């Protein structure tokens, strides 16, 4: 799980 913006977490990227 790479570090992403809180808004991107919904994508589970």
Curated annotation (Swiss-Prot):
It comes from Uperoleia inundata (Floodplain toadlet). Expressed by the skin dorsal glands. Keywords: Amphibian defense peptide, Secreted. This is Uperin-5.1. GO terms for cellular component: extracellular region. The lineage of its organism: Eukaryota, Metazoa, Chordata, Craniata, Vertebrata. GO terms for biological process: defense response. It is found in: Secreted.
